[in-house]
Amino acid sequence: MRVVILGSGVVGVASAWYLNQAGHEVTVIDREPGAALETSAANAGQISPGYAAPWAAPGVPLKAIKWMFQRHAPLAVRLDGTQFQLKWMWQMLRNCDTSHYMENKGRMVRLAEYSRDCLKALRAETNIQYEGRQGGTLQLFRTEQQYENATRDIAVLEDAGVPYQLLESSRLAEVEPALAEVAHKLTGGLQLPNDETGDCQLFTQNLARMAEQAGVKFRFNTPVDQLLCDGEQIYGVKCGDEVIKADAYVMAFGSYSTAMLKGIVDIPVYPLKGYSLTIPIAQEDGAPVSTILDETYKIAITRFDNRIRVGGMAEIVGFNTELLQPRRETLEMVVRDLYPRGGHVEQATFWTGLRPMTPDGTPVVGRTRFKNLWLNTGHGTLGWTMACGSGQLLSDLLSGRTPAIPYEDLSVARYSRGFTPSRPGHLHGAHS
């Protein structure tokens, strides 16, 4: 079957790889000159299934009000004047109760755990390189309340069979030796030994290279204008004066998927702006071993070979990609606080990207009401964590095979009432 994939981020390229391996003739289209040049370029580097959890959580609405007055707040909201933003935030608020949180976290962990298994198999099969480490993740708590709240997430981990260790502050250095210097600032941590890390952009670009060698075609520097439909079928992708045709089409444009599907399929995917710093390592014994997640500031600090990646925060501000100095200062503050000798912070590279987020935090993967239009988008802050599993799942569904995990609750059908966002005029390009 001829399949066109829209988007060359980590989710789009993973989809291309697995569809190619299933025997399909795959073409990937993107406006950028190469793979992983937008949202997949410089994310936090975590592959953390156990920490897969929606931003829509009990207590978040009240916390959001408090965060409005804090300099280093993990979440910020600025109205962009669109009805879609208001609807999306309202839907998110409706998911902030305990029942929805547990349901959403459960299916996110399910997909993320499966995805890590798929990545492990891919690594064994291809020996793909991406500065990957299998050293686990350590969530750090600064208050007793955070430490006590961890028991709620532990219940989900136990249900999913995810190994964990709840550590008092005196034991944190057993996992991350450099934290011995700052343990007095912390109340404890939750360690997930099976989690991994790696450079998402490096992985995506190497996988794209392997996919191309296997026969996948990449059409870079090719902005997409619109999908062309007739009845319940998509019959082409309009790119300037050219119409590219296939038997099936996969939407993996991240935050830009919603606008590109306007008038065809309503999906509630909204951009969640995040930031990162990439820092050269200064002192080896003062740097992280794997990944830590600061629960207070919602910031991850991840170890690559000779670099530290510091990423996090969430801004609900539309398609704004301005680099804000106060956000840089927050990232610098956290990494200096926890790893004061770890990196040359003054040499850091500052970056921002738009994560495609659904109100319930779970991606939309599967077929739409159009028989040949498929979705693989809305992974939020977990695109890297969920990419391989989502790609394999999509390939199985499109190929008519029974997937290895339950998938019905990942369909866009769970938003049956639909969203009707206005399509911004500047979004006629594609997104990776």
From Swiss-Prot:
Is activated by the HinT protein. Is inhibited by D-cycloserine. Its EC number is 1.4.99.-. Disruption phenotype: Loss of the ability to utilize both D- and L-stereoisomers of alanine as sole sources of carbon, nitrogen and energy for growth. A double dtd-dadA deletion mutant has a pronounced growth defect in the presence of D-tyrosine. It is found in: Cell inner membrane. Belongs to the DadA oxidoreductase family. SUPFAM superfamilies: FAD-linked reductases, C-terminal domain, FAD/NAD(P)-binding domain. It comes from Escherichia coli (strain K12). It catalyses: a D-alpha-amino acid + A + H2O = a 2-oxocarboxylate + AH2 + NH4(+). Pathway: Amino-acid degradation; D-alanine degradation; NH(3) and pyruvate from D-alanine: step 1/1. FAD binds at residues 3-17. Induction: By D-alanine. Is regulated by catabolite repression. This is D-amino acid dehydrogenase. The keyword ATP-binding does not apply. It comes from the Bacteria. One of its GO terms (biological process) is L-alanine oxidation to pyruvate via D-alanine. Catalyzes the oxidative deamination of D-amino acids. Has broad substrate specificity; is mostly active on D-alanine, and to a lesser extent, on several other D-amino acids such as D-methionine, D-serine and D-proline, but not on L-alanine. Participates in the utilization of L-alanine and D-alanine as the sole source of carbon, nitrogen and energy for growth. Is also able to oxidize D-amino acid analogs such as 3,4-dehydro-D-proline, D-2-aminobutyrate, D-norvaline, D-norleucine, cis-4-hydroxy-D-proline, and DL-ethionine. It is a peripheral membrane protein. GO terms for cellular component: cytoplasm; plasma membrane.
